[in-house]
Structure formats: C-alpha cells, structure tokens
C-alpha cells in the first residue's frame, strides 16, 4: 500500500470520528466512489451532503472522495466495515459475496429495459435486498440504489445478431458469468482489466468491448472503434452502503434523516444519469460513432442457457423480477 493511499485512508478514518459539541455530536460523513467529479453518482451524493449540512445546521457534513482516492470497491467496502469510511458506492458484483441473491442482477436480460430495472429496485425486491445487506454479518447498512445504465457492445463493425460476433475477441468484466454470456452471444469473451482496455483495442488484443455510452466516451475507446451496437444485454444497478460501525453511533433521528435523503439520491441520480447518457451519445455521434439497432430477441434466446445455468439457484427471485411490470 503506498504512503499516499495509506495517508488518505488514515485521514478519512480520523476525520470521520465524531467530536462532541455541547449535547450533540458533530460528524463528517466520508463518502467514496471510483468515478470522477461531475459523474451523476458524485453529484447526487454531494447534493445529499449539502441537504444534511443545512438540515442539521452544520452538525453533519460530508466529504466526497472520488476517482479511486480511497482505492477500488474492495478497499472501500473494507474501510466501511471498520468505520474508516461511512458511505461507499459499490457494484452488485462486489456485494455478491455478501448477499448471494444480488447475483441475480448479473444475468443477461434479467431486465427488459432500464424502466423495468428501476421498478424492481424501487419496489419490494429492492427494499428486501437492501435489508439483506443490512442483516448480513458484513457490518454494512444498505441505503439505496443507483443506475449504471445499459451495457451494449462496441467494435469496428455493426453487431445486429449473434452470428456477427463470431470470431471476435470481446473484452468482458472478470466474473465467469460475464465471459460465458459473451460466448453465448456469439463472441469470444476475454476478461481484461478496464485500465488495460484502451491499449488492448489499439493493438487488437481484443476486437471490442461492452459497456454504457459514458464509459465508451470517457475512456476514449471511441477513438479506436466506431460502432456501438444496441444489444442491451446487461442492465446492472449499483448500491450505496453505510458503515454499520458508524451507523450505530447515530441517533435514530439522524438515521431517519440519512435514509430520507438516500431515497432522494436514488431518484435524483437517475435523472442526472439519463442526462449524462444523452450528452455522451451526442458527443460520440459527433465524433463519428455509429449507433446500430440490434436484434435483442435473438441475443435473448442465445443467452437462455446462461440464465438456466446461473439462475437455477435464484429461480423464485428471478421469476419475481421478470414478473415485475
């Protein structure tokens, strides 16, 4: 661990300790996300901090750590578990080992579209999964959900059906489920670190990748490949959690206040996200990226074996998700 990184962690830990001021304790909520300033997650969380500060007359404030200043998702979870960090925005994949049912969201086409996903996380299923995180021994409190968009494939040629991916090496996230999903879609899934992808595209180590439009833009992948095909195979929500070690030190009133504003974050972030995606698509098109419709039904059928294999243990939950209207 570098001295710079260790220093940031220690600073976060010390600053998060409550200090007594009269009869009430002051608290600096340390919040962390891997994304850069201006990203919808960051903006929504910063707005929450402003509301908390205003409603508590400055007794509760928030400090936002962005751009992996406190490490990646694994490190953020570990820091939250010991109270060195209060709020961490993490992926479902990172929380899957804590609450196994969360893995149902990693399956291809589990959601029809983003509106379907939002209805699920806003409803009983979303609430139950937040509570399962809270009830787990992981010492985390599930606060709310965030939208991470729809993942589609991008390469140097249009991909409208599974046969179009034949022979193409496509970068995927590391989970074997995602590799097998890409293989079922017709390509050759290649697990690769996100930070390695730009050079891998340049050198043809991989022929393409899959992600949302903002990621294609901000990572500059559009400079190498110019066709974005709307397969819509993955729509994976994300969660933000609170350190239970810190949560238990809060009054019931402060807990209720944070929960109230967490719900607002969940609603606000998606509005910011939709605008962010629209702006990213406009910029990509201006840079010469071609957006191509794809036969989603063909890809859905091609990935049915993946849902059968990985979804068997979540059959009841999977049915509830699919039945949500």
State where each predicted segment sits.
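Positively charged n-region of N-terminal signal peptides that target proteins for export
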Residues: 1-4
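N-terminal secretory/targeting leader peptides
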Residues: 7, 24-116, 125, 131-325
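Bacterial N-terminal signal peptides
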Residues: 7-17
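Sec/Tat signal peptide C-region and signal peptidase I cleavage site
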Residues: 17-23
